[in-house]
Amino acid sequence: MARNLSTCLSPVVLASVVGACAAWVAPAVQAEQGRLIATGGASSIEGGAGGGIIPWAMLAGYDEQGEWGGNAFATHVDLPDYTLDVVGAAVSYGNRVEVSYAHQRFDLGSLVSKFNLPEDNLTQDIFGVKVRLFGDLIYDQLPQVSAGLEYKHQNDFLIPSLVGAKRDSDVEGYVTASRLFMGAAFGYNVVVNAGLRYSRANETGLLGFGGDRRDTRSVLKEGGAAILFNPHWAVGMDYREKPDNLSFAGESDWADFFVGWFPNKHVSVVLAYARLGEIATLDNQNGTYLSVQGSF
């Protein structure tokens, strides 16, 4: 999975899937009540608020100080040889702390017959916590900066162990910063995100953690940007760098290019083109990403 995707932003990162784009509505936009529409973000494939393939600094829901908020989501990624389905939910309190959960199912498709595999899918459970450290997406002089931890457990470790993975569960951390720049793109507002992840997950953990080539964590770059055309529509992209821990196959960086629709504070839909590159020896795994989220 050579990092040929590095140039594309984390294998399509599910085409900025994550609706990260939405999470950054212009401060000039009027909110229904409290926080602005879309500032709760979309849901990443690992459960936390942000873009499709990476977390951003915003938290799930539309809660303010002393309030609860959250969301539930379903995501489907259709690739030439695989499919990925994710369901999950996140709860936040006081726009300060977020707790999330995601269940991933990765159908192996043509890889099953190619290698006569004993299983036709891989599943993973992810439990996350994210804390807003300081700053604000819009109103503070400093960008909003958050830090998070994710505990991941791969539920079907036979195949990962056969290809060289060292463990079926692990903890990884990340720090991420997001900022909205008003009128920065021909008068349209722009949201920019940058982050670092400390991880040894193979294909985000679906192929276990660590490997015969490398069994230590790596510092990995993540980032994204979105243009907000109005309070309800955004387009953007995400990028996610990934490690190369397994000798049996390379691992591509991911990128995505997305369109996000946020009709109100309770519903969001993200459609993206995900460029995921090589996955488990099969190249050109680029396809469509669709995510639907309900928020409160």
Whereabouts are the PLM-identified features?
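Predominantly the C-terminal beta-signal and adjacent terminal strand-loop region
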Residues: 250-296
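Transmembrane beta-barrel domains of Gram-negative outer membranes and organellar outer membranes
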Residues: 31-157, 172-173, 178-184, 230-232, ...
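Extracellular/periplasm-exposed beta-strand and loop segments of Gram-negative cell-envelope proteins
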Residues: 109, 118-120, 153-168, 205-207, ...
